[in-house]
Each structure stands twice: as C-alpha cells, then as structure tokens.
C-alpha cells in the first residue's frame, strides 16, 4: 500500500511544456508542493538549467539557489524544485535580471524579461471570496494567496494587482466584456484577446468568447480566462508574438520572409 506522497516523476510523464527529451534520463524533477499545480508550473531547476542555461546539472542549480541569489515574487527560494507558475516574477539579483512567467502561443512558459520597475508587482486572478470569522472578508487568488479586507467591489474572476513588497492590493480589473485577457488553459493556451461575450450555463461551464488582435475569434471556458488589462491596454508587458497564434501557413510565410530579408 502506498503511504505518503509520491516523490518521483518519470520523464515521459512530465508535462509536455517543460520540453524535456525522453532519452537523456529516466526521471524528471518532481515539483515540490506549492502555490501552483504540478502540471501548470515550471520548477526552478528547469528554468535555470534548461531555459536560461545558467547551469549544466542539477547540482550546479542547487549551488546557485543555496547562495540565495534567486527570488520568486520577492522572496528568496532555495528549493530547486519550487513550482514557479503563471505570472510569477523571478529575479536574479546578481545579474540584475527579472523574468515574468507568461505563456507563449504554443502553450509553453516563455523566457520573458521585464524591467526592474515591472518586477515590483504581479497580477492575480481571484478564485474565491468569502466572509470569515468575525465578519472579516477574504479572497483567495490563483497563486494561493489569501488576502483579508479586500475592496468589496472585487468579485471572483476579477484580476488584482499586487505589490510584491507588501503583498497588498494596489488596483484591480473587473471581469468584463471589452477587457484584454490571456487564456491559461485548454487548446487556446497562451492566446491573448479582448473578451466579446460570456455565455452562462448554470450547472455546467460558462463559455467566454474572445477576439484577438488579428480579428480571429475563439471560445474557451471561463476558468481558463485571466484578465490582463483594461480595454485593450495590457497591465504587463507581453511576450514575443503578443499572444497572436498564427496558422501553420502564416508561420511558414513569416519564416520565408525572414529568410529572404536576411539572405
């Protein structure tokens, strides 16, 4: 009988977006328990070793982390399998670099560099609101933060802006048609567009229709929608491609055009 948590993760069973090859080994780093789900996070070791190439082995990553160089959301993290996830800010003091984890249109976490100014805040989606003991209102965000005494206008599915130094809410965006959003799950993962309408289906999943900057429309579940800006002004800098997914033919044409201009 299995007692206790699983401690291993086979490479073949690891999430596809980590982009690990099957043949280099048997195991993958199993993320620690933390604010993001196992299949929706990127362990620190993969970010530092496989994406940034700052280390060649897991041992080297451990040495980097143990010198307390790596901060996630303003807190030093020494656990190499710490699960960083969507919207997290990773700062490396030594090099003065800051990254925000956001999806590219292929549904992977892009290495998206940001300025020191932008690294001071993050956006969080409100998952749940309730009134606790002694009538204190609370809300819970997508990255497992519990915040007491929020603005009474903030409801579930809205997005709040959090100052990472204090953990306080500085601003919020209502979930509303006409606002800019990013898709954080499903087949349209990583696409960015403006919310056009919301179909309510009581007892089932609400469906949200989104239109991207090229005028392509698509629909996804409400739970996959993360509002990132008022109107069409995003509150964070967007990764390369601006969240517009190209068809295979469009990608080919773009590649050929780039080849001709350089050749």
Swiss-Prot record:
GO terms for molecular function: rRNA binding; structural constituent of ribosome. Its main location: cytoplasm. Component of the small ribosomal subunit. The ribosome is a large ribonucleoprotein complex responsible for the synthesis of proteins in the cell. Residues 42-104 form the S4 RNA-binding domain. PROSITE patterns: RIBOSOMAL_S4E, S4. GO terms for biological process: translation. GO terms for cellular component: cytoplasm; ribonucleoprotein complex; ribosome. The lineage of its organism: Eukaryota, Metazoa, Chordata, Craniata, Vertebrata. InterPro entries: KOW, Rib_uL2_dom2, Ribosomal_eS4, Ribosomal_eS4_C, Ribosomal_eS4_central_region, Ribosomal_eS4_central_sf, Ribosomal_eS4_KOW, Ribosomal_eS4_N. SMART domains: S4. Pfam families: 40S_S4_C, KOW, Ribosomal_S4e, RS4NT. HAMAP family: Ribosomal_eS4 (MF_00485). It is found in: Cytoplasm. Signal peptide: none annotated. This is Small ribosomal subunit protein eS4. Component of the small ribosomal subunit. It comes from the Eukaryota. Keywords: Cytoplasm, Ribonucleoprotein, Ribosomal protein, RNA-binding, rRNA-binding. Belongs to the eukaryotic ribosomal protein eS4 family. It comes from Xenopus tropicalis (Western clawed frog).
């Amino acid at each position: 009988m299995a007692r206790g948590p699983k401690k291993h993760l086979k490479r073949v069973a690891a999430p596809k977006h980590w982009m690990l090859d099957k043949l280099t080994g048997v195991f993958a780093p199993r993320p620690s328990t933390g604010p993001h789900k196992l299949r929706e996070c990127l362990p620190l070791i993969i970010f530092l070793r496989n994406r940034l190439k700052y280390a060649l082995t897991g041992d080297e990553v451990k040495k980097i982390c143990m010198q307390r160089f790596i901060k996630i959301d303003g807190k030093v993290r020494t656990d190499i399998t710490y699960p960083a996830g969507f919207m997290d800010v990773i700062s490396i003091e030594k090099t003065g670099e800051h990254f925000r984890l956001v999806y590219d249109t292929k549904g992977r976490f892009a290495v998206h560099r940001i300025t020191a100014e932008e690294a001071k805040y993050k956006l969080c989606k409100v998952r749940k609101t309730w009134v606790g003991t002694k009538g204190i209102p609370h809300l819970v965000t997508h990255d497992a933060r519990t915040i007491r005494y929020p603005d009474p206008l903030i409801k579930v599915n809205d997005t709040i802006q959090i100052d990472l130094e204090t953990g306080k809410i500085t601003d919020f965006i209502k979930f509303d048609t006409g606002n800019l959003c990013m898709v954080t799950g499903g087949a349209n993962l990583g696409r960015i567009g403006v919310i056009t309408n919301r179909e309510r289906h009581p007892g089932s999943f609400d469906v949200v229709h989104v239109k991207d900057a090229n005028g392509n429309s698509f629909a996804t579940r409400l739970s996959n929608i993360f509002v990132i800006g008022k109107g069409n002004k995003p509150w964070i800098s967007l990764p390369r491609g601006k969240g517009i997914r190209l068809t295979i033919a469009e990608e080919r044409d773009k590649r050929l055009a780039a080849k001709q201009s350089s050749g």
